[in-house]
Regions:
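Signature of Gram-negative outer-membrane beta-barrel scaffolds
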Residues: 84-170
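Outer-membrane beta-barrel domain signature, strongest for Gram-negative TonB-dependent receptors
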Residues: 1-84, 90-98
Length: 170
């Protein structure tokens, strides 16, 4: 859509929730569950010339939605050896939608006998791009800690992650 006489603005709406539950299975082990949800919606616009003719402007909409779940089991094998094992999952979608009218085409195109609106798209923008990224992550991890002395602790750990991503640019 044309951005002539655009009034710059920025709107942001963010939701972040997190729930952690710790369950002491016994004196030696604790199971922890961490669940989170994140949602961001942002819209903004800027005028490059800040004049009545709308010399140039952009309009951006960003959206992010993510869900994550982690389970951890931590415990002591004995007085000198402890462990941690866990699973992690995340599902995330990002959408970046932006358009730019660099020269105020909607205002000046009729002066040159040109249409101010592209009949194909219905926009007066120089360009318009929607970039969507979907990702899914799965991980398994663990560590073992050995208390060698009162002042020396040795930890070995590993993590395996698998990421799947798809990106589309329109």
């Amino acid at each position: 859509v044309g951005h002539a006489n655009l009034k710059p603005f920025e709107e942001l709406d963010t939701t972040l929730t997190r729930l952690q539950i710790d369950w002491d299975i016994n004196d030696m082990m604790t199971l922890t569950s961490v669940t989170s949800y994140f949602d961001l919606e942002e819209e903004g616009a800027a005028s490059y010339g800040y004049d009545v003719n709308g010399i140039g402007s952009n309009h951006t909409i960003n959206e992010t939605e993510a869900f994550a779940q982690e389970l951890r089991l931590a415990g002591d094998i004995n007085d000198s050896v402890s462990f941690l094992i866990g699973l992690f999952y995340q599902d995330r979608e990002l959408v970046f939608d932006t358009a730019q009218e660099a020269v105020g085409g909607a205002n000046f195109a009729p002066l040159f006998g040109l249409a101010s609106i592209d009949p194909t798209t219905g926009f007066s923008d120089d360009w318009h791009k929607v970039h969507t990224t979907d990702s899914e992550t799965r991980s398994i991890f663990g560590s073992v800690t050995f208390q060698a002395t009162d002042r020396l602790e040795i930890t070995a750990g590993a993590r395996f992650s698998e990421d799947e991503r798809s990106q589309v640019v329109d």
